[in-house]
Curated annotation (Swiss-Prot):
Naturally occurring in which organism (per UniProt): Arabidopsis thaliana
Tissue: Expressed predominantly in roots, and at low levels in shoots, floral stems and open flowers.
Listed GO MF terms: DNA binding
Annotated ranges, domain LOB: 7-108
Pfam families: LOB (PF03195)
Gene: LBD12
Additional facts recorded: Gain-of-function mutant pck1-D (T-DNA tagging) shows highly epinastic leaves, reduced apical dominance and sterility.
Sequence similarity: Belongs to the LOB domain-containing protein family.
Protein name: LOB domain-containing protein 12
One GO term (biological process): shoot system morphogenesis
Length: 193
């Protein structure tokens, strides 16, 4: 903000012109920091910066100047990538730190699982055994239905009460599987082939 006895703003000083009272650069480029405007002028040009500032509302101009100064400094440091290089570097660093955090959390979880009391692991084994028995029972019921459709005599044996147990014993399961294989070996498919 030029006037009698006051020094011109950094922009007017660098461009060697008289600083008017309504100079758009004066509030943002003070005379005591000439490097700030010099770098912005070098990268963007004074006329482009002036146009940008005039298109913005007054309350956003200070933030715009700060962004222009940051981008100009980044462009001088890295002429190819500018501030995009810094952003990419930081995003890459965030990704690496997130991976390290995930690995650390997985290690903590493993250590916690190793330090659990053996009672809980015994309880889990019992639950697995019960699930295994339920699976065998379910498999037995499926085999019974298949056998009932294929062999009326075996269905009669089931309905007459020869197999009254709710839980299938291993020997009865093996007997049923052998009977099914003998009845129609071509219809049997293995789950593991």
């Amino acid at each position: 903000m030029g006037g009698p006895g006051s020094s011109p703003c950094a922009s007017c000083k660098l461009l060697r012109r008289r600083c008017a009272k309504d100079c758009i650069f004066a509030p943002y480029f003070p005379p005591d920091d000439p490097h700030k405007f010099a770098i912005v002028h070098k990268v963007f040009g004074a006329s482009n910066v002036s146009k940008m500032l005039q298109e913005l509302p007054v309350h956003q101009r200070a933030d715009a100047v700060n962004s222009l100064v940051f981008e100009a400094n980044a462009r001088v440091r890295d002429p190819v990538y500018g501030c995009v290089g810094a952003i990419s570097y930081l995003q890459n660093q965030v990704s690496q730190l997130q991976m390290q955090l995930a690995v650390a959390q997985a290690e903590i979880l493993c250590i916690q699982m190793q330090n659990e009391p053996t009672l809980q692991s015994h309880h889990q084994v019992l639950e697995l055994d019960q699930d295994h028995k339920a699976l065998l029972l379910n498999n037995n019921n499926i085999n019974n239905c298949n056998t009932n459709n294929n062999n009326n005599n075996f269905g009669y044996a089931m309905s007459s009460g020869q197999f009254n147990s709710n839980f299938a014993s291993p020997s009865s399961i093996m007997q049923m599987q052998m009977q099914m294989q003998m009845q129609d070996p071509l219809k049997q498919e293995s789950l593991w082939t």
